[in-house]
C-alpha cells in the first residue's frame, strides 16, 4: 500500500508529465463527446410525418467550411440524432467564439466526404427542414460542391420563410426570438446543437397541433378523406 501511494504521489517528472497528459486527454475526449452524437436511440415525438431537420456550423465565413453538421431524422413518431464534427481543412476558425468549436476539436475528425455517406440517406428523397436556409442550406450546398458531391434531390422547407410570410409584424425572425414568441420549452444554441434541433422539433409539433393544414401543405402531404 505504501509503495502504491508513493507511486501515486511521486514527484518523478516523467510520471507527473504522464498523469498530466492523461488528464488532458480525458478532458479533450469529454469535450469531443459533448459535441457529437454518433449512435443514438429512437425517441418518441408528437409528429406523425417524415422530416429531416439539419443545422450546420462553419469554421469561418466561407460557406464550404462546415465543421459540424447536426441531423435529426423523424419518422413514425420517433426521432434519432446524428451530430458529427467535421474537419473542414481550413486554417481560419474565426467563428469559434460563436459555436465553441476549435481547430483542435476537429483535428482528428473525419472530412465531410467521409461523413456524408452516413447521413445522405436522410436527405435524398426526404422532407428536409432547417431554419434560415441562407446559412444552413447554402453551407450544405457549398460543402457538397467543395467535395465534388452531387446535391441530393429533396423536398426542402425553410421555416424562416414560413414565419416571415405569416408574421410580418414581428420585430425579428431569429430562431431565438421565435422560440420566445411561441413560448417554447426549448431554446436554440450554437454551442449546443441538440438544443437547436429540439427547438425546431418543437415548432413542428406546435404546427401539427395548431396549423395542421398549413403543415401538410408545406410537407406536400395530402389530407386524408373522411
Sequence positions of predicted segments:
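Short, structured loop/turn "capping" segments at alpha-beta junctions
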Residues: 151-155, 213-214
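Acidic, Mg2+-coordinating catalytic module of metal-dependent nucleases/exonucleases
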Residues: 127-134, 139-144, 174-226
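Conserved non-catalytic scaffold segment of RNase H-like nuclease domains
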Residues: 35-153, 176-188
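Short Asp/Glu-rich motifs
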Residues: 115, 163, 198-199
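Acidic two-metal-ion nuclease catalytic site recognized across multiple nuclease folds
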Residues: 2-43, 181, 201-226
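Short alpha-helix plus adjacent loop in nuclease-associated cores
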Residues: 157-174
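Residue-level "edge-of-site" marker
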Residues: 109, 157, 192
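A short acidic, often aromatic-flanked loop/helix-cap motif at beta-alpha or helix-coil junctions
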Residues: 91, 162-165, 195
Amino acid at each position: 500500500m505504501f509503495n502504491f501511494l508513493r507511486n501515486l504521489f511521486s514527484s518523478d517528472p516523467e510520471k507527473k508529465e504522464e498523469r498530466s497528459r492523461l488528464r488532458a486527454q480525458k478532458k479533450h475526449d469529454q469535450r469531443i463527446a459533448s459535441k457529437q452524437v454518433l449512435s443514438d436511440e429512437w425517441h418518441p415525438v408528437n409528429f406523425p410525418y417524415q422530416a429531416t431537420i439539419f443545422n450546420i456550423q462553419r469554421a469561418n465565413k466561407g460557406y464550404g467550411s462546415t465543421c459540424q453538421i447536426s441531423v435529426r431524422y423523424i419518422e413514425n413518431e420517433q426521432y434519432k440524432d446524428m451530430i458529427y464534427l467535421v474537419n473542414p481543412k481550413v486554417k481560419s476558425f474565426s467563428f469559434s467564439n460563436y459555436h465553441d468549436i476549435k481547430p483542435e476539436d476537429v483535428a482528428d475528425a473525419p472530412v465531410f466526404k467521409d461523413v456524408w455517406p452516413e447521413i445522405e440517406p436522410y436527405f435524398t428523397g426526404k422532407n428536409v427542414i432547417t431554419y434560415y436556409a441562407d446559412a444552413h442550406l447554402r453551407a450544405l450546398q457549398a460543402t457538397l460542391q467543395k467535395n465534388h458531391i452531387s446535391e441530393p434531390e429533396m423536398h426542402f422547407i425553410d421555416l424562416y420563410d414560413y414565419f416571415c410570410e405569416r408574421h410580418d409584424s414581428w420585430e425579428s425572425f431569429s430562431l431565438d426570438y421565435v422560440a420566445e414568441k411561441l413560448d417554447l420549452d426549448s431554446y436554440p444554441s450554437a454551442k449546443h446543437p441538440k438544443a437547436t434541433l429540439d427547438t425546431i422539433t418543437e415548432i413542428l409539433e406546435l404546427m401539427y397541433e395548431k396549423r395542421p393544414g398549413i403543415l401538410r401543405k408545406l410537407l406536400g402531404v395530402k389530407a386524408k378523406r373522411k
